[in-house]
């Protein structure tokens, strides 16, 4: 079968192109937020599904909002082609509950984009988000649709006649969640296993949970989410003298790898 590049997909007639891209969006989103999957209009008559489909690039982005003028999307996803593994690469996916409280962790006190904490941070908002049960990188609560989304991602991958999906676990908790949905590691498995070992009593990460910051409190080793906040706060770099590097992960369409680098985990 001939692989359909994303650039070629973007060049298809609009109706066919849109049909294929819409397979990325969990059906539950259309149903819950009363968005017509054919007209792409919400109950207020606003077009709330948009995309970016450059015909000269192997990438595409689709997003869904609750109201047209909303700052945050309900759903936003960008995919591209990974030439090395001949796979579909998931650049990012964001799924927000628009009715939940917003935490401005994405902008600092000067209004600059924090770039997921790589350029700057908004500590007060991060503390609020953590206390509300959110993980690093989240501005709102999610909709618990990741399992459904992975199925959508597999359908989309099949439309391109590809068999492999790749992505990066941007945060520690992201990698753990991708494990749960059938992904394994191309790069980073040993690091993830080491992290679990060092978070156990007597480990280097465990010993650094000293309460020196709100993100490094004792007991944080017990959950995926609090481990992730501690690593995001620089605990990994401080304890192991090396920077956290997002693992590269992959999944075969129709196959779930049974990987679990945090046995008996609590999210």
Language model features with spans:
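Non-catalytic substrate-recognition and accessory regions of acyl/acetyltransferase enzymes
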Residues: 1-138, 155, 159-160, 164, ...
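Conserved acetyl-CoA pyrophosphate-binding loop and the N-cap/start of the following alpha-helix
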Residues: 141-152
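Short His-Asn-centered micro-motif
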Residues: 167-170
